[in-house]
Amino acid sequence: MAGIGIVDSVSNHSVDQTVDRLKGILQSRGLTLFALVDHSGEAEKVGIKMPPTRLLIFGSPKAGTPLMLAAPSIAIDLPLKILVWQDGEGKVWVSYNSPDYLRERHGFPAELLQNIGAVESLAAAAAG
């Protein structure tokens, strides 16, 4: 049920397990986890129930800064984000913005695509 430019993959793990796996992968690759937003936890605080939904915001200034220098508007989409969420049927998903879509959206040079291309392998490793 992906929107424009969003890649969705099924996870073989629970939301908590997928998030933990992703945190470990980020650390092992030397990436900084800037924030972990627990959307469902925040919703619960105001009396609204929703399935587990967590957003990880991460990156590396070494990879992101050249992109922002080439196309300043990409700063609205950086740091990178991976959403881990559970649908109404209990299936867990890992979602992220397609690097190709971000390139098309912001118009940065093709040679810089590798700076954000790792999001695909990160998501796959966390979901697998």
Ranges and model annotations:
Residues 1-29:
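Terminal, regulation- and interaction-focused segments at domain boundaries
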Residues 34-83:
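Compact, glycine-rich, soluble single-domain proteins
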Residues 81-109:
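Beta-strand/loop substructures that line and gate deep hydrophobic ligand-binding cavities in soluble
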Residues 104-128:
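Well-ordered alpha/beta subsegment
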Residues 18, 22, 39, 63-64, ...:
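Amphipathic alpha-helical interface surfaces
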